[in-house]
Every structure is written in structure tokens, then in C-alpha cells.
């Protein structure tokens, strides 16, 4: 699993998850920053892709690979690790330190049956 994130006030905001499965476990910490927020449209298939790519290019949003503990240069392509979004999402585990869930974070995630 990989995570797109941004840093706000020293805390990580998860903007997107990437995985082949249908479950996401948001870590309590990304790249040394506590995860306190799930961004708007994080699991929605209706995210503004142009804005997101612009933020990736400007390094406002970064990609983190927990397996290596390192940042990646670009967004994974769908064949390597697809975005976990929309009808694909069935289970999401949130960290205890999460304080905010952004607007439409689970928009059209109609298969979502478990949120922990």
C-alpha cells in the first residue's frame, strides 16, 4: 500500500491510498508525522485529478511507501499500484489520532461495509 499525503501544521493529511486490494489501513504516522486528517475525496473516484497532479508536481503532495519507509517521486500508475477508490473500497481502518475526515472522503464508496 502507498499513500499520497500532504503536511499541514506538522501533521500528515492522507489524500489518497493505493493498493490492489479492497481494504485500507491508514497508519498513525507517515514519514515521521502523525496522521490527523483524511483529505477531501480521499477514497472517491471523483477527485479533481488535474489539481492533484499539479500538487504532486509542486511537491505539495507526496507519495509515501511504508514498505520502504521512503517517499516516491511520482504517483504510482494503475498497473503498478492502482488508487483504492469508489466501489473498490470495502474496509477502512483509521488511526486513533485521526481528528478530521474531509468532505466527500467516501463519496460513492457504495461497497464500504466496515469503518474502524
Model regions and ranges:
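Structural signature of tandem-repeat unit edges
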Residues: 1-11, 19-36, 48-100, 110-116
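Consensus positions within tandem repeat domains that build extended binding/scaffold surfaces
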Residues: 41-42, 102-107
Amino acid at each position: 500500500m502507498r499513500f499520497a499525503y500532504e503536511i499541514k501544521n506538522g501533521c500528515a493529511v492522507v489524500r489518497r491510498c493505493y493498493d490492489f486490494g479492497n481494504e485500507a489501513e491508514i497508519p498513525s504516522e507517515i514519514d515521521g508525522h502523525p496522521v490527523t486528517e483524511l483529505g477531501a475525496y480521499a477514497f472517491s473516484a471523483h477527485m479533481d485529478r488535474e489539481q492533484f497532479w499539479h500538487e504532486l508536481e509542486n511537491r505539495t503532495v507526496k507519495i509515501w511507501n511504508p514498505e520502504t519507509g521512503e517517499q516516491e517521486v511520482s504517483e504510482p500508475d494503475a498497473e503498478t499500484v492502482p488508487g483504492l477508490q469508489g466501489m473498490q473500497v470495502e474496509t477502512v481502518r483509521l488511526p486513533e489520532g485521526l481528528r478530521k475526515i474531509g468532505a466527500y472522503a467516501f463519496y460513492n464508496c457504495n461497497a464500504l461495509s466496515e469503518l474502524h
